[in-house]
Amino acid sequence: YRGLRALGIEINLFTHDEKHATPDACFPNNWHTLRDGKLKLFPMKDENRRLERREDIIEFLKHKHPNLVVDDSLLRYERQDPPKFLEGTGSLVVDHEERVAYVALSERAHEEVVAEHCAAENLTPITFKALDARGRPIYHTNVMMSVCSSVAIVCADSIADPADRRRVLDALA
């Protein structure tokens, strides 16, 4: 924090007190993205994660960026029976240059929500199932892969289906 400020980077710090009951609030990338003048809100599986979408933070962003468009169209999936989710850039690993979204499908990343988001953002979805060393689903894609401008890091062995693994690796090549 201090190092960034020393470099002249403006930081707006929002604290999450115990009263907020949001222990995972240090991961705001799961409930929103900010890109091209749009604040996109994502449906979250756990109720305490939904509490992170604080109105004071959203209002601050709207005040700071008067032309900001708030897109909450995906939040309706939280209210469906059964509910469906897509936890932001925890679930979505986006290659912005190639316009591809890699998504490990899980209880926190439902294919229907992925398809709608990708269509709206002009992204090609590449979905797959990923498992940890004990055979449990990996719930956020960003724990098993990352895509940067000139390099990608992926734990290919976690992609359960060999055909899916090949599809992901080919897309990254």
For the regions a language model picked out, list residue spans one by one:
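The feature marks the mature, well-folded catalytic cores of soluble enzymes
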Residues: 1-173
